[in-house]
Amino acid sequence: MSMSENTLCKAAFSDILLDGDITPCCYIKRNSNTSKIKDVDNLNDWFFNNKELISLRENLSTNIKDNKCNVCWKAEAEKKWTLRTSQEYKLQPPKAKLLHITGGRLCNLACRMCGPSFSSMIQVENRPWQNDNSLDHNYNWIDDQDNVAKIVQFINNQDIEQMQLQGGEPQLMKGFVDIITQIDSKKRSQLGLHVTTNASIFNEKFWEQAVKFWRVTAGISIDATGSRYDVIRYDGDWKTTEKNCVNILDYLWTNRIDPGPNPALNLNIVFQLANVDQCGVMNSFYEDLQKRFPGLAFQYTMLPITDMGASNKAWDIQNLPLEILNSLPDIKEDTQLVKQWRQGIDYAIENNGYNENYKQQVLTREEYFLNVYGKNLWTERPDWFEIYNR
């Protein structure tokens, strides 16, 4: 039975997400009963005995769509990527295999589609459509040595297979370096490490510790190249990011554990208005990296922009003007990336939700970006401004 025909989810049975809270994944609905890492002494005990998690597993294993997972159910109905369907899973007893740590909000970029929960730059910027005064000031919980000790103890005493680090920007966070340094050397040689980074910097001391793990995957987040990149990932510079991307991959390859599995790149692409016309460019960028680093393993993830926050619906490709969608170039390459890109556009055309509300949101936000950063999407596509401004 395929994942589209059942309600099973790998995350509920084998994953732990730490982001100050403790949950199976970042998409799950939270409430007042959601556990906090500061209140939990033993992560292994939480994994097996938390009542809400036990209830979730019971529902998912009996084909009941638990409402805590509505983000995935809705996205799947719209034929979009979901964490659940991206990972094949057959029912088996719970066993903690993946530890996913979102260490805080410390970041050096202010990406247009991101929010204050994941970027200290955006928190300071205080965008009017994202105002969230509930965020505490201690945004790097991972730097608390009590939390570091809990995590290191858990990893050293359990059979975790994979650890994922995410920010903010992990290369900037001291707590992450503390964790990957303090894990037993034998454990490191058995444990996969996935680091999600914007590649705006290259912290060699961070990667010096990272390459000691069994297999390292650099999850590099790039949605466009050149000047288009610069109006998506504000405060970033494409030439710097491109250079750092190459430096990271080169370092992973040169310093890999040999013999052992080859390091990997996972290219993270947030699919949105600002890059909907960049299919050919991104396909070429991805293929060029494969040619440059033939020994690396390669994969990509195309994330719908609504994964970055509910306030992003106006930038979802399903909610763009049909005139823009129908005018996009037909890319001839027959790669999997191109096919998925094309399928997303086709679905957006068939299920278009563009309306006056989304139009006004886009116009207002682009004006905001122009005022704050001196550039916006209309700098790149003045013809799109004409369409939105009618």
Please describe what each predicted stretch is.
Residues 1-139, 156-157, 337-390:
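N-terminal pre-core extensions flanking Radical SAM catalytic domains
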Residues 89-90, 144-153, 200:
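A Trp-anchored, charged/polar loop motif used as the substrate-binding/catalytic surface
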Residues 96-106, 117-146, 158-174, 186-203, ...:
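Core AdoMet radical
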Residues 99, 147-151, 179, 241-244, ...:
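Alpha-helical packing segments of well-folded alpha/beta enzyme cores
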Residues 132-147, 158-163, 180, 318, ...:
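Eukaryote-biased activation of long, low-complexity terminal tails and linkers
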Residues 150-156, 180-186, 209-211:
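Leucine-rich repeat
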Residues 175-182, 204-210, 278-282:
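Distinct, well-ordered alpha-helical segments
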Residues 194, 213-219, 239-389:
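Conserved C-terminal portion of the radical SAM core fold
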